[in-house]
Amino acid sequence: NYFVNTEGTEVVQNRTYARIMISASMKAEDGMELPLNMSYFAYDPKDLPSNDRMIADAKDMVKRLTVLRDAPVVDPYTGPAILSGPASGVFFHEIFGHRIEGHRLKGGGETFKKKVGELVLPADFQVYCDPTLRSYAGEELNGFYLYDDQGVKARRVDVVKDGILREFLMSRVPLDGFPHSNGHGRTAGGGDPVSRQSNLVVETTAPHTEAELRSMLIEEAKKQGKEYGYYFKEVTSGFTLTGEGGSLNSFNVTPLEVYRIYVDGRPDELVRGVDLIGTPL
């Protein structure tokens, strides 16, 4: 990619990577489509998983789909739930990440516009976007770049510190209180650059193991008089509306693999037909 502007900026950067995606689906007897998918990403093809690993993953996907095809359909439910690590990543990207993109704070998408300096997450949470990270915890990251699509040098943006909202992701288009770009002007498909997420990282100073989260889920379900809570193991991006142009401020994330966690100790039960919907307010 080549970038030149009247400020005298000249940027040449190449971005090559390898990605393999596996998708499979089955149809239940009632006609419900049941998709599952996975992907592998690396900047060098030699760092992709072995063929044996990917074949084993594909076979496991078929086994899970076979069970999912015969799983019960859920009823409407309001109650406690927990998300796996990968599912939490999608959740934060859709529900939180899009609402800290500066251009969305104009024209009605103002969920957090007046929340700067206020507590928006638990005090042990830190959220930042860092396009300079090529990997994190041993995983290569797709959001890595050195300069954004407006020629601005990439940098880490600490969006939330100790639960308090500090900053938004900015392109060259200013926002009240945030007059300058912080290296997040991005484009796709030849469109105009807008402020978009890079590598969104969510950290906590008070982490819990999966076993601890399950125990907390069961206790909360008991408090609410529920027979079970839900565990979202795998989800895929749905859509989010941020209130721009008068649209409803809402989100819809598509769960692919969801389990009922029973409070009486029964085995976890795979279910289908789940939608994860709501508003961020």
What are these regions (language model features)?
Residues N1-R156, K161-I164, G177, G225-E227, ...:
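Active-site bordering "gate/hinge" segments
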Residues K115-L281:
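Dual-mode signal for accessory low-complexity, basic/Gly-rich regions
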